[in-house]
Amino acid sequence: MARSFGANSTVVLAIIFFGCLFALSSAIEEATKLGSVIGIDLGTTYSCVGVYKNGHVEIIANDQGNRITPSWVGFTDSERLIGEAAKNQAAVNPERTVFDVKRLIGRKFEDKEVQKDRKLVPYQIVNKDGKPYIQVKIKDGETKVFSPEEISAMILTKMKETAEAYLGKKIKDAVVTVPAYFNDAQRQATKDAGVIAGLNVARIINEPTAAAIAYGLDKKGGEKNILVFDLGGGTFDVSVLTIDNGVFEVLSTNGDTHLGGEDFDHRVMEYFIKLIKKKHQKDISKDNKALGKLRRECERAKRALSSQHQVRVEIESLFDGVDFSEPLTRARFEELNNDLFRKTMGPVKKAMDDAGLQKSQIDEIVLVGGSTRIPKVQQLLKDFFEGKEPNKGVNPDEAVAYGAAVQGGILSGEGGDETKDILLLDVAPLTLGIETVGGVMTKLIPRNTVIPTKKSQVFTTYQDQQTTVSIQVFEGERSLTKDCRLLGKFDLNGIPPAPRGTPQIEVTFEVDANGILNVKAEDKASGKSEKITITNEKGRLSQEEIDRMVKEAEEFAEEDKKVKEKIDARNALETYVYNMKNQVNDKDKLADKLEGDEKEKIEAATKEALEWLDENQNSEKEEYDEKLKEVEAVCNPIITAVYQRSGGAPGGAGGESSTEEEDESHDEL
């Protein structure tokens, strides 16, 4: 029997954006359009990038030699910093250093998680059009607001540049991962961040699914049930999958998009803040610099406690010249976070129930995310599965990027025979439906439905002579729409007037291979229909905003380039001046070969240049270049004369002919 909805009732639409079921033919078709496709794990606290190359995955180290990069962005009076450089200066520049932005992306400003985070971070989170924006001072004291997508785009750009430096070519295509329990708005916002970073996001896939690929890529043999337990810096996912000779089928997923290592750090920080207040009668909770130092040391202590039973948290001059030194035991750390650790078991139970499996049917428990190194978390998981040891065979920091890179290899065609049999069957994490009479959430696509999928249901009118139905689309698990999330709405007009219950209106939900949901409503009698793909109804960035942010990102990149050129020009001048200074005083080089006032001329030129450098710390590239030419105009003719007198070829101070022992030019530290 057809269900009814009133003139003002609604149909729920949800868009689930993630990667998915793909047939080999479609992968080959897509590969013809794509270049090399990198895999990026865009994490709350750290990010990682990999590429499928020469038959295997390469996890790519950044310019500091590290395979994971802090998801931090800092602004100073002269430049923008991303990664280690941003994190390292956070303690002295807290209000202008942004981190944990993944906890804001795709959320509304009034979300309770956002309001909680506002009190915990040193930078300002402000309300703009109902969304949380980050307000910071950039160069020259100018205040600017950035969307979470823009900050995420800066991190994605860093990962893109890391891959480009390794591969020696420009990259435009990427697979980007998201927590399995991310809702539609968070997925769409992540895709928008990719666009701002100049990337075509070829696929968004779920982090636990990517990790399962990393675990199961080389696993042959029979069917295996695995549970992926992914506890990272800011988010938590559990997925239950069946792996069978390259087919990865997700049976269920659950999680908490606001639970992770950052929460454990905050508990330790709160403990020490109270201790300081008690011992020193000093409240540091509003002192951003002190909190920055404490945050850094609490994170270090947490990591150390995974392998030690006690650490000492020591911070020189934490506040008012007072040095801080306190022990922290593993037992105390576990006590402070006991409820949070136990909270992770709830989603495990729900995922198991939804998958319809008994504990004994799980063949492997795969640990992903840095927080799974915590012994207490491992113990709780082991106890839940009645003594079964978790598998520690995958690198918890790199597994997600590894799986994303495999997916990238499939999409680009670079995966070849090694990946040709892989098939991913992922699921929609949240139920999608429409509102019917009385505000009831009528489900069309239940959670954990394999995607792509298409579901239709016939509805009817609630009032006599009703000619319009207003359809609202929701996602969520509650029975009433007021407790679910509205994704969008549209009207179907022109229904021929008829008694209530007579018209037949077919509503179709279709989630494609990318997890995008399209909703169509059609009046069967008249053939009149309307379609919707959710876009701006969710507070998503408009195309105009995205275009503006892309332009600004390009301007930032240009600015970063100029800063580097300026530093290089200054270094070139300094190197030349010091090199000349050393040569005129070195008997093995120029000291004994100079005649008349040649030495005085060089010394005067180098002295004047060094004094100019001291007074012009922040000059433009052109000024440094000009000053270098001035010094060279004095020194180079003298050097040429010296070499001609001694029968050698002429050469500048920095030239390879100046002495045989001259080292080749290196960037200075």
Swiss-Prot record:
Feature: compositional bias, Acidic residues: 658-669
Expressing tissues: Expressed in mature pollen grains, and pollen tubes.
Motif, Prevents secretion from ER: chain positions: 666-669
GO CC terms: chloroplast; endoplasmic reticulum; endoplasmic reticulum lumen; Golgi apparatus; mediator complex; plant-type cell wall; plant-type vacuole; plasmodesma
Keyword Endoplasmic reticulum (UniProt): yes
Activity regulation (UniProt): Binding to ERDJ3A activates the ATPase activity of BIP1.
Signal peptide coordinates: 1-27
Subcellular locations according to the entry: Endoplasmic reticulum lumen; Nucleus
Induction: Induced by heat shock. Induced by DTT.
Gene deletion effect: Bip1 and bip2 double mutation affects the fusion of polar nuclei during female gametophyte development. Bip1 and bip2 double mutation affects pollen tube growth and length. Bip1, bip2 and bip3 triple mutation is pollen lethal. Bip1, bip2 and bip3 triple mutation affects female gametophyte development during the early stages.
Keywords: ATP-binding, Chaperone, Endoplasmic reticulum, Nucleotide-binding, Nucleus, Signal, Transcription, Transcription regulation
GO molecular function: ATP binding; ATP-dependent protein folding chaperone
Chief localization: endoplasmic reticulum
Function: In cooperation with other chaperones, Hsp70s are key components that facilitate folding of de novo synthesized proteins, assist translocation of precursor proteins into organelles, and are responsible for degradation of damaged protein under stress conditions. Involved in polar nuclei fusion during female gametophyte development and is essential for the regulation of endosperm nuclei proliferation. Involved in sperm nuclear fusion with central cell polar nuclei at fertilization, which is critical for normal endosperm nuclear proliferation.
NCBIfam families: PRK00290.1
Family designation: Belongs to the heat shock protein 70 (TC 1.A.33) family. DnaK subfamily.
Subunit record text: Interacts with ERDJ3B. Interacts with PDIL1-4. Interacts with BZIP28 (via C-terminus) in the endoplasmic reticulum (ER) lumen. Under ER stress, BIP1 dissociates from BZIP28, a transcription factor involved in ER stress responses. Interacts with ERDJ3A.
Anything else known: Baeckstroem et al identified BIP1 in a Mediator complex pull-down assay and suggested that BIP1 could be a plant specific component of the Mediator complex. However, no experimental evidence has been brought so far to confirm this hypothesis.
UniProt name for this protein: Heat shock 70 kDa protein BIP1
Organism: Arabidopsis thaliana (Mouse-ear cress)
Gene for this chain: BIP1
